[in-house]
């Protein structure tokens, strides 16, 4: 049976993290940084460590328990326990870039994407390839790698979850190209389906297929609506990747609104 998150639970989780913020004063003292974590106007804790000086972004888990400090450019991600005011783990990359770091909606797992790993490298990939992975926050153990062998679609910082928290969808557009979307199990990291590029209409100047630039899963995770680079929307079976229907072309604003409605209502 699929677990559906009650609206009240979702609102409480949202409120829990909405009041939290991390302020980092760099080079105070020189060569270090001081971080103050707030709940509203209340200071929860303060920390001063050299590792904080390279932090470029911070994220809280939906329930407010965890804080991620991301050091993109220095190649590591810190995980902090906000209740204890302690750093519990530092995830180390082989190289300097951090491409993505996100919590799952239930705050029980963590998605990370960086090149290789100084702890347990994936023998299937060269160290310089990104190796996106899913982690269990209770055990601080890696659950699985979240990419397919074709390297067509994988987590690299853009993820959307079904409302029930069971499935997640990845798209990876960048400044140069966009590819297919993909659907994964958000609890186990198991690959489910690839959503192919959408062929251009007959007579179009472009050839091949349009790549995905955004996606949303239906509340039950059984369908996925994909927005392509030409602002067409297409709906798919999320378990098989089978095309159900092409909804047509929309303005950028309308396409975004359609995606959000689909995520809320499944239509």
Curated annotation (Swiss-Prot):
SUPFAM superfamilies membership: YVTN repeat-like/Quinoprotein amine dehydrogenase
The entry's keywords: WD repeat
This protein's name: Uncharacterized WD repeat-containing protein DR_2484
Intervals holding WD repeats: 50-90
Domain of life: Bacteria
Organism: Deinococcus radiodurans (strain ATCC 13939 / DSM 20539 / JCM 16871 / CCUG 27074 / LMG 4051 / NBRC 15346 / NCIMB 9279 / VKM B-1422 / R1)
Alphabetized InterPro entries for the sequence: Quino_amine_DH_bsu, WD40/YVTN_repeat-like_dom_sf
């Amino acid at each position: 049976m699929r677990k559906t998150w009650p609206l009240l639970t979702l609102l409480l989780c949202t409120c829990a993290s909405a009041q939290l913020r991390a302020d980092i004063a760099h080079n105070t003292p020189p060569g270090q940084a001081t971080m103050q974590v707030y709940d509203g106007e209340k200071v929860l804790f303060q920390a001063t460590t050299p590792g904080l000086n390279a932090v470029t972004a911070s994220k809280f888990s939906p329930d407010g328990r965890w804080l991620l400090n991301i050091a993109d450019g220095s190649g590591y991600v810190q995980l902090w326990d906000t209740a204890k005011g302690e750093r519990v783990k530092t995830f180390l990359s082989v190289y300097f870039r951090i491409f993505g770091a996100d919590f799952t909606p239930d705050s029980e797992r963590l998605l990370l994407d960086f090149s290789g790993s100084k702890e347990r490298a994936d023998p299937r990939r060269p160290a310089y390839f990104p190796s996106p992975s899913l982690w269990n926050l209770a055990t601080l153990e890696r659950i699985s790698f979240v990419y397919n062998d074709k390297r067509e679609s994988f987590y690299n910082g853009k993820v959307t979850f079904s409302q029930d928290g069971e499935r997640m969808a990845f798209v990876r557009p960048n400044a140069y190209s966009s590819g297919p979307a993909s659907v994964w199990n958000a609890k186990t990291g198991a690959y489910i389906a690839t959503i192919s590029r959408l062929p251009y209409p007959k007579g179009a100047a472009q050839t091949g297929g349009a790549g995905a630039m955004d996606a949303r899963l239906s509340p039950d995770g059984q369908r996925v609506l994909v927005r392509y680079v030409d602002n067409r929307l297409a709906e798919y079976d999320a378990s098989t990747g089978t095309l159900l229907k092409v909804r047509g072309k929309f303005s950028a604003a309308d396409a975004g609104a359609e995606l959000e409605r689909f995520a809320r209502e499944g239509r």
